[in-house]
């Protein structure tokens, strides 16, 4: 019986694969943003912190839309000092700069919660609860402003719908602060770029940021 013949080694054409993106780069790519070098400094008086109203803490990750984009969108991840009460080590910020204010006043909003939480928000902001006249919206979203009457008059159905989408049940807990053309949503819990809830949150925030302001006739 003839012996076995040794077959020559076969060379398989391996395909080169690009290395997987890290979660931050993947989030930026998905939403059309460009990863940027984070700003230096971690105190509240650095230009970046002051411009966007951030508390102390180093910004470790940053992505933003093209400079010519309107509105200008940014996503930032920031480390924060250790807080025994919240146990939050980092915070996610969604930031939009619009050419014109969404509402003519300064205001803030968050999902409706315990009455004590609302009282804390009122004390810290000095604002009053805004009653839009839409009972369903007012029960789901708390809007605070020092100019409550003017803010209420500007809460059109489109604005209410966009805010309700941002604070719908299942979204990460957070607070939206607005003044001038600036909108900034800040997480009240740890939310990382790989969190499955971030995609829907980003879409809702962009919908609010791109909302057109209806001018009086």
Task: Describe the residue ranges of each PLM region.
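Short, positively charged and aromatic/hydrophobic N-terminal segments
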Residues: 5-6
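N-terminal alpha-helical "arm" segments
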Residues: 2, 12-13
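Membrane-proximal amphipathic alpha-helices
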Residues: 17-20
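Charged, low-complexity intrinsically disordered regions
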Residues: 25-31, 37-217
């Amino acid at each position: 019986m003839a012996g076995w013949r040794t077959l020559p080694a076969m060379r398989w054409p391996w395909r080169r694969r690009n290395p997987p993106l890290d979660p931050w780069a993947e989030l930026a790519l998905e939403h059309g943003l460009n990863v940027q070098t984070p700003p230096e400094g971690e105190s509240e008086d650095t230009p970046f912190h002051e411009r966007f109203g951030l508390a102390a803490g180093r910004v470790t990750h940053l992505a933003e839309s093209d400079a010519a984009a309107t509105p200008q969108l940014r996503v930032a991840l920031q480390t924060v000092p250790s807080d025994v009460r919240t146990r939050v080590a980092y915070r996610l910020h969604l930031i939009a700069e619009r050419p014109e204010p969404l509402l003519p006043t300064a205001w803030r909003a968050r999902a409706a919660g315990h009455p004590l939480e609302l009282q804390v928000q009122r004390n810290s902001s000095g604002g009053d609860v805004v009653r839009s006249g839409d009972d369903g919206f007012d029960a789901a979203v708390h809007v605070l402003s020092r100019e409550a009457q003017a803010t209420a008059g500007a809460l059109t159905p489109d604005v209410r719908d966009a805010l309700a989408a941002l604070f719908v049940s299942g979204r990460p807990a957070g607070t939206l602060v607005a003044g001038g053309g600036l909108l900034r949503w800040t997480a009240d819990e740890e939310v990382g770029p790989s969190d499955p809830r971030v995609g829907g949150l980003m879409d809702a925030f962009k919908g609010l940021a791109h909302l057109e302001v209806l001018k009086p006739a």
